[in-house]
Amino acid sequence: MKTLLHICCAPCANQCIEVLRGEGVELTGFWYNPNIHPFTEYRSRRNCLREYAQTIGLPLLEHDRYELRPFVREVAADIAGRCVKCYALRLFETARTAAEEGFDSFTSSLFISPYQKHELMREAAERAAEEYGVQFLYRDFRPYFRAGQERARELGFYMQKYCGCVFSEEERYLKESKRIP
């Protein structure tokens, strides 16, 4: 089965790739993450993924345009509900690309994170699969999260501290500032 794997970052992807390859799935990575801010963060994550993909022989398709403004316009009206729109944005683009490029299915490394809203991601992926007529290959990768983080550290990957969006970064720093006396 030829599957397009949306990849948010190399640390999240390494165990997803290992699991799926272990199942005999033929993978191609897909970089599309308009939510990531600032540009230096976007570039660090993208470059880390490029190096990792090359090292493990993973073909990689890149929708490599820094699209912060369209992302912010999309989510700004409902900051609290931004994650649903962000998941949909990335998963619909992954499904569209999978259909156009002749893949049998698609999935995402987002499904490894215990910090993401898993059921909302799954619903978005299922809607995207229906719209584009390509199978959504669901896997709950969360049990592999810690092993993936450990492996990423062993490999010297760039390790980020937030999901990527400007609003998540803001929340992170606001929480930290409240702990400082």
Question: Where are the model-predicted features located?
Answer:
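Nucleotide-activated chemistry modules centered on ATP-dependent adenylation/adenylyltransferase
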Residues: 1-181
